Swiss-Prot record:
Disulfide bonds: none annotated. It catalyses: Hydrolysis of proteins to small peptides in the presence of ATP and magnesium. alpha-casein is the usual test substrate. In the absence of ATP, only oligopeptides shorter than five residues are hydrolyzed (such as succinyl-Leu-Tyr-|-NHMec, and Leu-Tyr-Leu-|-Tyr-Trp, in which cleavage of the -Tyr-|-Leu- and -Tyr-|-Trp bonds also occurs). Cleaves peptides in various proteins in a process that requires ATP hydrolysis. Has a chymotrypsin-like activity. Plays a major role in the degradation of misfolded proteins. HAMAP family: ClpP. The gene is clpP. It comes from Helianthus annuus (Common sunflower). CDD domains: S14_ClpP_2. The active site is at S101, H126. PROSITE patterns: CLP_PROTEASE_HIS, CLP_PROTEASE_SER. Its EC number is 3.4.21.92. This is ATP-dependent Clp protease proteolytic subunit. InterPro entries: ClpP, ClpP/crotonase-like_dom_sf, ClpP/TepA, ClpP_His_AS, ClpP_Ser_AS. One of its GO terms (cellular component) is chloroplast stroma.
């Protein structure tokens, strides 16, 4: 029997009685954000809106983004990454479960020294993919060109934020490279591994 999203009591400052709000709403008020699905425009826009709102509300308190994502669409993921760099508060990224593909790109985008993985987390990097079925030749060439630009952008960010040489990141992005939490730390995707 599905129970839906759990509700928890929350008392707004100055109010006597607590009201019941869904757990994510309560956690957002504590500046705790969650990416627990495939990255698409909807979740990306929701997280971007929350980051901007919380940044306007108080730009001195850090934000915490918990990630358990199989990856997803490149453009919405890059938009989320750019927002993380844009907002004034530091964004801590925490990998729990897995951060694959675009999930690992968002993970590496956290404030350097404030990127963490749980001990049994898994991280995977690879190159962006496109779908070229039933595409005319001219469009195919344009799409390949755009895909190469996106790959170049992602590679540049991984190089900048991990400290790895371009040739290492480029070679690793040629295929799916899976890493444990400690391997992701050695690679420079995260800075810390939580203690068991």
């Amino acid at each position: 029997m599905p129970i839906g999203v759990p509700k928890v009591p929350f008392r707004s400052p100055g109010e006597e009685d607590a009201s019941w709000v869904d757990i994510y709403n309560r956690l957002y008020r504590e500046r705790l954000l969650f990416l627990g699905q495939e990255v698409d425009s909807e979740i990306s826009n929701q997280l971007i809106g929350l980051m901007i709102y919380l940044s306007i509300e108080d730009d001195t308190q850090d934000l915490y983004l918990f990630i358990n994502s199989p990856g997803g669409w490149v453009i919405p993921g890059v938009a989320l990454y750019d927002t993380m760099q844009f907002v004034q508060p530091d964004v801590h990224t925490i990998c729990m479960g897995s951060a694959a593909s675009m999930g690992s790109f968002i993970l590496v985008g956290g404030e350097i020294t404030k990127r963490l993985a749980f001990p049994h987390a898994r991280v995977m990097i690879h190159q962006p993919a496109g779908s070229f079925s039933e595409v005319a030749t001219g469009e195919f060439i344009l799409e390949v060109g755009e895909l190469l630009k996106l790959r170049e952008t992602l590679t540049r960010v991984y190089v900048q934020r991990t400290g790895k040489p371009v040739w290492v990141v480029s070679e690793d992005m040629e295929r799916d490279v899976f890493m444990s939490a400690t391997e992701a730390q050695a690679y420079g995707i995260v800075d810390l591994v939580a203690v068991e």
